[in-house]
Swiss-Prot record:
<dbReference type="InterPro" id="IPR049166">
    <property type="entry name" value="GH39_cat"/>
</dbReference>
<feature type="glycosylation site" description="N-linked (GlcNAc...) asparagine">
    <location>
        <position position="372"/>
    </location>
</feature>
<keyword id="KW-0326">Glycosidase</keyword>
<keyword id="KW-0732">Signal</keyword>
<dbReference type="Pfam" id="PF21200">
    <property type="entry name" value="Glyco_hydro_39_C"/>
</dbReference>
<dbReference type="InterPro" id="IPR051923">
    <property type="entry name" value="Glycosyl_Hydrolase_39"/>
</dbReference>
<keyword id="KW-0378">Hydrolase</keyword>
<feature type="binding site">
    <location>
        <position position="264"/>
    </location>
    <ligand>
        <name>alpha-L-iduronate</name>
    </ligand>
</feature>
<feature type="binding site">
    <location>
        <position position="91"/>
    </location>
    <ligand>
        <name>alpha-L-iduronate</name>
    </ligand>
</feature>
<keyword id="KW-0510">Mucopolysaccharidosis</keyword>
<dbReference type="GO" id="GO:0030200">
    <property type="term" value="P:heparan sulfate proteoglycan catabolic process"/>
</dbReference>
<feature type="signal peptide">
    <location>
        <begin position="1"/>
        <end position="27"/>
    </location>
</feature>
<feature type="binding site">
    <location>
        <position position="349"/>
    </location>
    <ligand>
        <name>alpha-L-iduronate</name>
    </ligand>
</feature>
<dbReference type="InterPro" id="IPR013783">
    <property type="entry name" value="Ig-like_fold"/>
</dbReference>
<dbReference type="InterPro" id="IPR049167">
    <property type="entry name" value="GH39_C"/>
</dbReference>
<feature type="binding site">
    <location>
        <position position="56"/>
    </location>
    <ligand>
        <name>alpha-D-mannopyranose</name>
    </ligand>
</feature>
<keyword id="KW-0458">Lysosome</keyword>
Amino acid sequence: MRPLRPRAALLALLASLLAAPPVAPAEAPHLVHVDAARALWPLRRFWRSTGFCPPLPHSQADQYVLSWDQQLNLAYVGAVPHRGIKQVRTHWLLELVTTRGSTGRGLSYNFTHLDGYLDLLRENQLLPGFELMGSASGHFTDFEDKQQVFEWKDLVSSLARRYIGRYGLAHVSKWNFETWNEPDHHDFDNVSMTMQGFLNYYDACSEGLRAASPALRLGGPGDSFHTPPRSPLSWGLLRHCHDGTNFFTGEAGVRLDYISLHRKGARSSISILEQEKVVAQQIRQLFPKFADTPIYNDEADPLVGWSLPQPWRADVTYAAMVVKVIAQHQNLLLANTTSAFPYALLSNDNAFLSYHPHPFAQRTLTARFQVNNTRPPHVQLLRKPVLTAMGLLALLDEEQLWAEVSQAGTVLDSNHTVGVLASAHRPQGPADAWRAAVLIYASDDTRAHPNRSVAVTLRLRGVPPGPGLVYVTRYLDNGLCSPDGEWRRLGRPVFPTAEQFRRMRAAEDPVAAAPRPLPAGGRLTLRPALRLPSLLLVHVCARPEKPPGQVTRLRALPLTQGQLVLVWSDEHVGSKCLWTYEIQFSQDGKAYTPVSRKPSTFNLFVFSPDTGAVSGSYRVRALDYWARPGPFSDPVPYLEVPVPRGPPSPGNP
């Protein structure tokens, strides 16, 4: 393919951002100090989750979750490097189950659609957030009906046993089984759910899972927990699990492996954490036995209403805010031993599929285009900056480093425009090597300031001696890394051409400066002027003994005539200190040539050559910061099926 824009110009611009002192700053620079020799505590990647809800009618959920559009979407979600997203929390999964028979005559279940969806997740190395939600062909209508309560327990037990047999207990025990989503919103479709019915339903879920294996975990209720007497079902469930009576065993108290709540930000980052603290304190006061029970916020979005178009959801504004929320939770909650509660998971509910006329502006990870002027019509997805940001977060490692932001002598916490998360990886053996990541955000929550830059001085010290120490910078802002911005510059085409898609995809990745030797003495000083909003990742690596491992699970997915998607796994690559993946193509399966593309560490690539020739074989390998290649993946053949000639369908967006 042709170069899409002068690479040298982009790198020169990034170099000027990082190396040149800001000209006439309007305010004192922010000083970011990081001590690589001062590890504080473990850094758990508690943010690696997303979710979505199939649209109405829920009885046809299979048509959405198994659609080609969603298959592409989940390929993108699973392609975040280093399992940067590992869970997809999904509503209405039991609408994928068909019930046969009737009460009194025996029931049987068809799990074909559910099998298909869970297989799709597993193919993309994703876990389900498994909400036990749906009426299974409308059979379940009333959980005060004791017969239905026993039948529900049997259904839950049957599906749990089925997937233990299909995937193994080691895999299924990682799933977060959860109650019906947001019970106090009463979105039960045709199911009657009283307080007693909801408690009966929960006990049936619990005992059904336990019958399959005690290793399976169950939590809930996944709701807002407004102050009592509001949210009666949520508080009632906690009361029941704390000291109520188990419907099946008659014992006092019912297991609750985690407490899930939903608090969103109303366009404020810090509001999410502040609300969580209030709810956690109420839970501790009312139910002291749950003081150590893990708490999830598995819908922790900056704003309610996934389909509500918002300009800031389209670009780096959203990406930087998501990083800011995560940094606030780590720095203000988990690292604060005096006020910490057992916070275990933060999920953004943003794996939906966008629709016309707002491909970028809805709460999604990808931008979806339904291209109806081809024969046949087809779908294209673009990676939004928020999904790219999950890849930057994936470069953080298991130990948090001491880091501090100050301005004019005043130390600033994470509830300010500039913040930082820093981590290190300690070698686990002779073949391993030390590395550190410093992720700096510039974010004013949902507000973008196109003409404003923030002067920053980053001082990193304490880097231990090591072989071949280098550093790499990756930078995102709306001027350089916004497919939405490129789409607007192109005139917002409804059906972009192949060339227009190439131009938008050229803005998907961060601008990366090639590896440079770390200065002597284990110290590094950078003086970037960060646009507001923006993200800057500084990655420092010692050279591992061996080059990267092999790329695996390479697949080729068709897009349209002359275009395809390549997806692969980095699970055996090992190193995080990767510069790019080299992709090679062969028309005859013998002589391979490299595909020209920008450096990228995302585990997915859209091949859309000018020639339109895509039939052949493909292979992929990783290249590290020292230009050492790993082994090629096993080759994957792709044969394009010719499309019958004829006029394109005009279609409608």
